[in-house]
Amino acid sequence: MGEVASNLKQYPARNVEIIVHVDEMLGETKRAELVNALEGIEGISSAEFCPLRWHLMLINYDRELLNSQQVLTGVVANNVHAELIGPV
């Protein structure tokens, strides 16, 4: 994954940040598990929940490797309901 993250630094035009709305109210442990799972996907450089708005996630990814629907699929694959809001 470090190589993918360095690619984003090397090619910033490939970096896209999106907002995803998570329907469930997730506890701290489940949020951490979801972030770890997403950051383990090749092409995703970072994932985080917005402080005080725990239903919103900011996810950075390499658009040469993934598209927004694939990122959303990665979220939903972790047994949560979510919708793509759009780019930041």
Can you say where each PLM-predicted feature lies in the sequence?
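Helix N-cap motif at beta-to-alpha junctions
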Residues: 61-66
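A generic structural motif
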Residues: 55-60
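Short amphipathic alpha-helical segments
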Residues: 26-30, 67
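Short amphipathic alpha-helices in soluble, non-transmembrane regions
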Residues: 33-40, 70-79
